[in-house]
Amino acid sequence: MRWLWPLGVSLAVALAAGPERAPRGVWLQQGGHQPVAQEQPDRSRRGAEREDAKGLQQYVPEGWAEYPRPIRPAALQPTQPWVAASPSPDRARATGGSGQEPQGNVTGPPGQRPQVQNPLYPVTERSYGAYAVLLLALLLFAVGIVGSLAVMCIVWHSYYLKSAWNSVLASLALWDFLVLFFCLPVVTFHEITKQRLLGAVSCRAVPFVEVSSLGVTTFSLCALGIDRFHVATSTLPKARPIEPCPSILAKLAVIWVGSMTLAAPELLLWQLVREPSPAAGTVDTCIMKPSAHLPESLYSLVLTYQNARMWWSFGCYFCLPVLFTVTCQLVTWRVRGTPGRKPESRPGPQEPRGARPSSTVAGLAAVHALCALPENVCNVVAAYLSAALTRQTLELLGLVTQFSTFFKAALTPLLLLCVSRPLGRAFLDCCCCCCGEGCGEGCGGRAAPAGPRAKLHTELSASGYFHKPREAPPLLALGTPC
């Protein structure tokens, strides 16, 4: 019985320690001397992981991560790109579970909302420049919008002015209207407040519309020069055949599609960058930088366009229309001055003399050259002397480049109304009718002649611009009833 005393001692110790201090997994076999350790089944909640299997990155319920997350050398390095975490899990669940909102191609200090600055009040040194830019923008906007709408409405409502020539002029007026209506407010707002309207969308859309407008002007000048040369060298009789409407639409489609295709790389070239500023808080800047997420072939194409963009614009949008117009004018004058050459057919009453003068093409080319020259000079200076220039100088060069395009868009329809006699006459008649003076009275202080002959002349001139003829015209109409 001596072997029973160790058993009694162990039982006494176990009872004295209690069930809380008894070692887990220690069980006594009735027929043995040594304890055998058995594994207890894990009583943790089903689906829960062990603490040692979890990652090193722990989340505190009330301490949400900031953007960007700080990288600690001792912690686990993140393998996913930084994501802006939402301030609460409910908001993250409402936005789709991730809490990430699309930011486009915006880079800069995150988590900081852009603050719109108002330099107009209170008046400071910067206010004078802001007021000058605002007044100039308002003047260009008013003149350009009124002129563009006038040209488009006259060509659209006039029966005898719906020709290929006038349709090209109306196309120019339409693109000038788009540039002034969409691009001018965005550029002016950015210059005053240093914030970009519509963000990255306007950063890409504004250059695309401006370059497309340059392409439309270039191809339109080439088309007008060719048309003027055909008119000068044509041997057709005075009553020319009517040009069908599909032919006019095909010419306009070639001009528009070609211009927009050449301007398509602008949509992939520009990106919006937000930089911190001690004065304005955040400054939006549009830079030429292709996105790294583009395919390899497309990225190389856009990069090639970026490297050749300056000289491509100078050659295609400045040299080509100017040289082409000058060449066509010289050849036309040479042909018209040839001895034995019959003069051009005299236009009829429905198309007054000067409907297609050479001065219209020459004036359009001169305005385009004068407005595009400062833009190209600023681009060359900014490209080759950017290291020696200050930031303020570069911003001034960019502003001159933008407003050169706006000057061209505002002056082109005004030139058409002043140089083209049918457009100018129709505009004056429309102004007289709107002022309540009546189309029968003379405009500009001229007295209307009395008599039935003068009345017939007035009716013919008015119906030729705004209404379809009630009876068959004495000559074949030169316009196309589209």
Curated annotation (Swiss-Prot):
It is found in: Cell membrane; Cell projection, Cilium membrane. Its main location: membrane. Glycans are attached at N105. One of its GO terms (biological process) is positive regulation of MAPK cascade. Residues 1-25 form the signal peptide. It comes from the Eukaryota. Residues 25-56, 78-119, 338-358 are annotated as: Disordered. Disulfide bonds join C203-C286. GO terms for molecular function: G protein-coupled peptide receptor activity; G protein-coupled receptor activity. Residues 156-167, 227-251, 332-361, 420-482 are cytoplasmic. Residues 26-134, 189-205, 273-310, 383-398 are extracellular. Gene3D superfamilies: Rhodopsin 7-helix transmembrane proteins (1.20.1070.10). The keyword Membrane applies. The modification Phosphothreonine is found at T480. Residues 40-54 have a biased composition (Basic and acidic residues). Keywords: Cell membrane, Cell projection, Disulfide bond, G-protein coupled receptor, Glycoprotein, Membrane, Phosphoprotein, Receptor, Signal, Transducer, Transmembrane, Transmembrane helix, Ubl conjugation. The chain crosses the membrane at residues 135-155, 168-188, 206-226, 252-272, 311-331, 362-382, 399-419. G-protein coupled receptor. Has been shown to bind the neuroprotective and glioprotective factor prosaposin (PSAP), leading to endocytosis followed by an ERK phosphorylation cascade. However, other studies have shown that prosaposin does not increase activity. It has been suggested that GPR37L1 is a constitutively active receptor which signals through the guanine nucleotide-binding protein G(s) subunit alpha. Participates in the regulation of postnatal cerebellar development by modulating the Shh pathway. Interacts with the PTCH1 receptor. The N-terminal region is required for constitutive signal transduction. This is G-protein coupled receptor 37-like 1. It comes from Bos taurus (Bovine).
